[in-house]
Amino acid sequence: MKVKELGHIVLYVSDLARSRRFYGETLGWREITPGEGIGFSAAAFSSGRTHHELLLIEVRGAAALPRGRRLGLYHFGLKIGETDDELREARDELAAAGVRIVGATDHGVTHSLYIEDPGGNEIELYIDVQPARWKEDPGVMFSDPVARPLRL
């Protein structure tokens, strides 16, 4: 067996309406949920790459994620463009929507902004920097692992 690509992410959420607004309106992800008749309270989103990349399932009354370092998912990354100008535009749109940026990092291979969704899941919004460099040598990502503050 060989994994070909990461297909989708499924998140449990406590408030589907709030999470649906965040991923659909704030992040601009296209919702593809058929509406009624799926048997449970959920919303699916796709960028058009595949049938769905994100599925939100409402689980009311579940415990919130613990804050800080913990086992399990740290964050997931969403590529939002190709240039720092697009990253700046995203930063400004997030600020206008009242979304707090919790980090901004130059990883060498990416420039990244970090935010949290309404349920506390961390999301990396990024652009690739010199994609040919890491495509030719994936190990370059770890050759200089120092994360630097990103100044946009």
PLM regions and their residue ranges:
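Core segments of cupin and vicinal oxygen chelate
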Residues: 12-54, 58
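Catalytic cores of nucleotide-enabled group-transfer and carboxylate-activating enzymes in metabolic
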Residues: 18, 22-25, 32-34, 56, ...
